[in-house]
Amino acid sequence: MTHQHPYHLVDQSPWPLTGAISALMMTSGLILWFHINSTILFILGTVLLVLTIINWWRDIIREATFQGFHTLSVSNGLRYGMILFITSEVCLFFAFFWAFFHSSLAPTIELGVSWPPTGITPINPFLVPLLNTAVLLSSGVTVTWAHHSILSGNRVEAIQSLTLTVFLGVYFTILQAWEYFDSPFTIADSVYGSTFFVATGFHGLHVLIGTAFLAVCLLRLYNFHFSNHHHFGFEAASWYWHFVDVVWLFLYICIYWWGS
């Protein structure tokens, strides 16, 4: 009886607190990992974060699908929230590109007054990075196919296309990890290595998050949680995935191709 209104008034929840604690544990764990080579706190923070995400998303799915709390007004509010979240992510990556161009457009004498810096062998942009570009752009096509299938009520094609999208996301992550292990330079190799691994690493983290987001949507699709007029969870995931696609295009053009 407490929800006989169209507004988004959330119930008391422990998950923001556990999420904040997990973030503190992970950042503190990273510091310990860097300085004393101990990964225990980082792993515990990661486990707590995963448990928080599982339980928080479970509660949201329960509210949206089974309790009917996600009215039109609530859905519109969630849309605005997702748009603002993606905008904040744009600002995050803008900072990485700023750092890259600040260093590359006017390389200092310590770098040999050249870009890439003297002694750095860049990754060939027409090998694994080009394949990764094709993989990620293909996943953008398949997630759009899934969206249109949901809108038209074609559940079978929606499941097929979303499964393919998740597979392409996992494949991209494997290729990126392979590229890192095979890289001729490290994050410690001047500002070139720092900007390269921070920018592409954060993008890879976003691909992992987006893949998890889409995998949850696939599970919900199997369980008949989406209809052609009520599927904002999938819409939010697809927006996020398209954002990841666009960021990769800028990374490929600026850092891999022009930066090499």
Curated annotation (Swiss-Prot):
Note the Pfam families from the entry.
Answer: COX3
- Alphabetically list the UniProt keywords: Membrane, Mitochondrion, Mitochondrion inner membrane, Translocase, Transmembrane, Transmembrane helix
Quote the subunit structure annotation: Component of the cytochrome c oxidase (complex IV, CIV), a multisubunit enzyme composed of a catalytic core of 3 subunits and several supernumerary subunits. The complex exists as a monomer or a dimer and forms supercomplexes (SCs) in the inner mitochondrial membrane with ubiquinol-cytochrome c oxidoreductase (cytochrome b-c1 complex, complex III, CIII).
Please state which protein family the record places this protein in.
Belongs to the cytochrome c oxidase subunit 3 family.
Query: What Gene3D superfamilies does this protein map onto?
Result: 1.10.287.70, Cytochrome c oxidase, subunit III, four-helix bundle
Q: Which protein is depicted?
A: Cytochrome c oxidase subunit 3
* Species in which this protein is naturally found: Pisaster ochraceus (Ochre sea star)
Q: Which PANTHER family match?
A: CYTOCHROME C OXIDASE SUBUNIT 3 (PTHR11403:SF7), CYTOCHROME C OXIDASE SUBUNIT III (PTHR11403)
Location of this chain's protein in the cell: Mitochondrion inner membrane
Task: Kindly list the residue ranges recorded as spanning the membrane.
Answer: 30-50, 81-101, 126-146, 158-178, 196-216, 239-259
Purpose: Component of the cytochrome c oxidase, the last enzyme in the mitochondrial electron transport chain which drives oxidative phosphorylation. The respiratory chain contains 3 multisubunit complexes succinate dehydrogenase (complex II, CII), ubiquinol-cytochrome c oxidoreductase (cytochrome b-c1 complex, complex III, CIII) and cytochrome c oxidase (complex IV, CIV), that cooperate to transfer electrons derived from NADH and succinate to molecular oxygen, creating an electrochemical gradient over the inner membrane that drives transmembrane transport and the ATP synthase.
PROSITE patterns the record matches = COX3
Catalysed transformations (reactions): 4 Fe(II)-[cytochrome c] + O2 + 8 H(+)(in) = 4 Fe(III)-[cytochrome c] + 2 H2O + 4 H(+)(out)
GO CC terms, sorted:
mitochondrial inner membrane
